[in-house]
């Protein structure tokens, strides 16, 4: 993966902050031994220019990460575990039970800080090591998060194994337990079904979705996992369907256009390449 300089990360986040997106995950407070390119998380938080109305979040694996994130000024922390025992041990270096015990410590650390706490469930729609995860297991973790008192829950399709029928069923089940404002869906486009899954989730009642600028991303502990759904492609789809997003799509596209030069390679997103439906082109010379 390409190593972005701290100043470049800050510039990207500052540009994104002006596009109307509601939340930006700034960085992750993980061990620099595990993911060295995230060792500047605190410096990135310190360097960004915050915009009113934007929530700046951080991913945390444990109490130390949560304390560091809150000290750095994260408005929201996202604690994560896998539904799959095997993936959790590969990704988090602990069992699912140990992760849940650690989350109790995170809740204690966050008490009184005013920080928003989100609980994420990785491999909610399938694991590359174990295969499909029973809905009952996902719902059991949702209940555990609710018992802990989290503010929101995310269902993550970490390896892009979800399909629209499966998504609609699980989202419907989870929305029997929590409201749509407390549920986020996190899809990867590994098998080309990312936006189809968004539509299925939306039709089932979900209203919050994670996405990555340019369709970047992945998971170092998931074989073959590619990027998240592309932010500008997602916004474009919703806007074309008449669903308002409050995001300035033109500004978002301009930010995405800076990525290939920064990264030194092309990006998966399609809208930047194809243009919007409203764009008009000259006829080729005969």
Model-derived features with residue positions:
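Catalytic cores and adjacent flexible loops of soluble metabolic enzymes
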Residues: 1-286
